[in-house]
Regions:
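Nucleotide-sugar donor-binding/catalytic module of glycosyltransferases
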Residues: 1-151
Length: 151
């Protein structure tokens, strides 16, 4: 089974974070590592993240959850911390306020990847931009890059 790491970067996002955590909690796919990387928030973000971890553990979702709160140098530093802590085969960035469109999103992704020896190096998809009520504002379609480099 393919392990998917979700990295959620957050900083003082108490009003946005819960919907992101709920979206991950509801995923039907079990082999999930969820890293919540917080930039030392001064609001209730840490409390919300820790309550989510406890709720997920009690519900026996199978999701591994790590909450890390320490000062960082902004979003990209937090993302890099998440990459370094990740143990999954693939990393998904789902920041505070972001959600998956379906409860089966990760299940569909894992199924489309398969368990073959030749796994794709990058997976990407379109982005739906929605308002606070969840109504679609527009869709951002991505083009595959012509060249990728890894450093």
């Amino acid at each position: 089974m393919i392990k998917i790491t979700i990295v959620t970067c957050t900083f003082n996002a108490e009003h946005e974070l819960q919907r992101t955590l709920d979206s991950v909690f509801k995923q039907s796919y079990a082999d999930i590592e969820h890293l919540i990387i917080d930039g030392l928030s001064t609001d209730r973000s840490i409390e919300i993240a820790q309550a989510y971890k406890q709720h997920s553990d009690e519900a026996e979702t199978g999701h591994e959850i790590l909450v890390c709160s320490e000062r960082d140098k902004g979003l990209y530093d937090a993302m890099n911390k998440g990459i370094l802590k990740a143990t999954g085969d693939y990393i998904v960035f789902l920041n505070a306020g972001d959600t998956f469109p379906l409860e089966t999103t990760l299940e569909h992704i894992a199924h489309s990847i398969g368990d073959g020896e030749a796994l794709p190096g990058v997976i990407y998809g379109d982005t739906n931009v929605v308002n606070d009520d969840g109504h679609l504002l527009h869709r951002r379609r991505l083009q595959p890059p012509e060249k990728l480099t890894w450093r």
